């Protein structure tokens, strides 16, 4: 049981480190953090950033390699992300008309990043 707790703690810390790394990358590129780990009724969004008028919803995936990280984002999770984003946008002045996109940030076991901008639509 202790090994499971230890692995869970390791995974949690690795996920936090991945989010921190991705956030630094976005900030370096001029984005401003709006919310981190935003949670609505429909689910959680890892990072919400803004560049000008555009809102960027970022899902961070960390694994041994980029392929495994990418494969861990399934259709059900994408549907939850869409629903959570719609919930967040409902509070924006322009609502669903707010310019936005979904990015997926892949982080491999060595900490390298690969950002897939506009990874999937929002319809």
UniProtKB/Swiss-Prot annotation:
UniProt cross-references to Gene3D superfamilies, sorted A to Z: 3.40.1350.10
Pfam families the UniProt entry points to: UPF0102 (PF02021)
GO molecular function list: nucleic acid binding
Family that this chain belongs to: Belongs to the UPF0102 family.
UniProt-recorded name of the protein: UPF0102 protein SPO0400
